[in-house]
């Protein structure tokens, strides 16, 4: 696609923006040649564990326009100004021979939004558990069934005749750690 744009529009410069589905390393490499650049959404969940821990570490965030570092754990998210502010941090990343910057944002408002949605999905999952009948498997990241855990063995490890369904608290905790966070990766240089 980018090659076609270069040919058809005779562009000498452009910034490629996409979601992570079109953000492969090969696409990023191509879009770092010449006077091209890119900004691509980046999945925090799919990052290597050590990189994800750095990205989600609550220290070294800033408000846009400020050089002062903020520890997200110190925020009073009930304060309206804090609630409506987006915080960010930049993490240098080297992918092969490409120097990139991961920009991680945190928004208390986005966190609250994600929690409201998940709470409704958990309520739906509880209704499914309490409704007699066969249970289906969760199909995607928005399916309430992803919060349902099926147990088919007894605590002693014996095979059970009956399957027991419960809310999967571990799955809820895994998802909660990403609440409020969003990331993009770019090769653009300069101030955020």
Tell where the protein language model's regions lie, with residue ranges.
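Anion-binding and metal-coordination hotspots
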Residues: 1-192
């Amino acid at each position: 696609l980018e090659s076609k744009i270069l040919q058809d529009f005779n562009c000498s410069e452009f910034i490629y923006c996409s979601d992570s589905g079109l953000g492969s390393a090969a696409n990023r490499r191509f879009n770092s040649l010449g006077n091209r650049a890119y900004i691509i959404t980046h999945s925090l969940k799919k990052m290597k564990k050590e990189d994800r821990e750095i990205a989600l570490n609550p220290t070294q965030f800033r408000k846009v326009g400020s050089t002062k570092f903020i520890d997200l754990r110190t925020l009073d998210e009930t304060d309206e100004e804090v609630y409506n502010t987006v915080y960010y941090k930049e993490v240098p990343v080297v992918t092969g021979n490409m120097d990139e910057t991961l920009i991680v944002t945190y928004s208390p408002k986005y966190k609250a939004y994600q929690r409201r949605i998940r709470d409704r999905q958990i309520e739906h999952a509880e209704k499914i558990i309490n409704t007699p009948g066969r249970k289906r498997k969760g199909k995607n990241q928005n399916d309430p069934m992803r919060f349902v855990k099926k147990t088919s063995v007894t605590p002693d490890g014996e095979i059970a005749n009956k399957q027991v369904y419960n809310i999967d608290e571990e799955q809820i905790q895994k998802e909660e750690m990403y609440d409020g966070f969003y990331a993009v990766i770019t090769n653009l240089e300069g101030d955020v």
